[in-house]
C-alpha cells in the first residue's frame, strides 16, 4: 500500500527538498519494482553499494533494501517478525529474490511479502546470497510484528535467530520507541 506517486523520481525530488542524501530503494523483492530498479539505477561510485537515478544528476543515493514479514510457528507459538534486508548491490538482491522464490515465496503478492519462513531461515538465505548483506529486525518493540513484540515475539535475539544471532548487527527500534527503555536491554549494548 503505497502512494501512486511512489516512483524513483519522486523519491529523489522529495529527498532533495528534505535534505536527505541516502534513502532506501524499498521493496526490492517485488518483481515489477525490482525490474524498475535494474532499469533506472546505476551504482555510483562503482563498488560503493550506493545507486543513483540514471536520469538525474542529483547527489541523492539509494541503498538496496526491502522489508519482509515472517509468519511461522516456532516452539508451539505463532511468530510474526518483520525484517529489513540490506543488500550490497542489485546482484545480491537478485540472488535473495531467487532464494526466496525457490523456497515458495510469492514475491509478486506485496511490496512487503508475507513469508512462511522463520527469521532464522531468512538470515540463511540472505547470507547465502552475499555475506555483505545485513538483516535488521524491524520496529522491534511493536506488539504484533516484531522480534520483541508482546503478542508474537521472542524474549531475546538468541531465541529468534539461534546460532545466527552474531549476524544481527543492528535493530530498528521504531519511531515510537523509548531510547531509555532500549538502553535497559543489555542484549542491545553491542548492536547498532
Q: Which role fits each region the language model picked out?
A:
Residues 1-4, 29:
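Di-metal (Zn2+ and/or Mg2+/Mn2+) metal-binding site signature of metallo-dependent hydrolases
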Residues 3-15, 153-161, 182:
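Short, acidic/polar
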Residues 12, 34, 38, 123-127, ...:
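Short amphipathic alpha-helical segments and helix-helix/interface helices
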Residues 155-162, 171-192:
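Functional cores that coordinate and move charged inorganic groups
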Residues 35-172:
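Extended substrate/RNA-proximal surfaces in nucleic-acid metabolism proteins
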Residues 12-33, 134-136:
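Divalent metal-dependent hydrolysis catalytic cores, especially in the metallo-beta-lactamase
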Residues 28, 140, 176:
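Flexible loop residues that form catalytic
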Residues 10-12, 23, 66-72:
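Short secondary-structure capping/turn segments at boundaries of alpha-helices and beta-strands
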Amino acid at each position: 500500500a503505497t502512494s501512486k506517486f511512489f516512483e524513483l523520481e519522486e523519491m529523489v525530488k522529495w529527498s532533495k527538498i528534505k535534505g536527505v542524501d541516502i534513502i532506501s530503494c524499498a521493496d526490492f523483492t517485488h518483481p515489477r519494482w525490482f525490474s524498475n530498479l535494474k532499469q533506472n539505477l546505476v551504482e555510483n561510485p562503482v563498488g560503493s553499494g550506493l545507486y543513483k537515478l540514471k536520469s538525474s544528476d542529483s547527489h541523492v543515493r539509494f541503498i538496496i533494501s526491502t522489508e519482509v514479514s515472517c509468519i511461522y510457528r516456532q516452539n508451539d507459538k505463532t511468530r510474526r517478525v518483520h525484517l529489513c534486508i540490506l543488500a550490497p548491490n542489485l546482484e545480491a538482491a537478485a540472488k535473495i529474490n531467487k532464494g526466496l522464490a525457490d523456497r515458495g515465496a510469492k514475491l509478486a503478492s506485496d511490496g512487503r511479502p508475507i513469508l512462511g519462513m522463520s527469521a532464522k531461515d531468512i538470515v540463511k538465505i540472505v547470507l547465502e546470497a552475499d555475506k555483505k548483506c545485513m538483516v535488521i529486525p524491524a520496529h522491534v518493540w511493536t506488539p504484533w510484528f516484531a522480534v520483541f513484540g508482546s503478542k508474537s515475539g521472542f524474549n531475546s535475539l538468541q531465541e529468534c535467530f539461534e546460532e545466527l544471532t552474531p549476524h544481527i548487527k543492528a535493530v530498528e527500534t521504531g519511531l515510537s520507541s523509548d531510547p531509555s527503555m532500549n538502553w535497559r536491554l543489555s542484549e542491545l549494548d553491542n548492536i547498532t
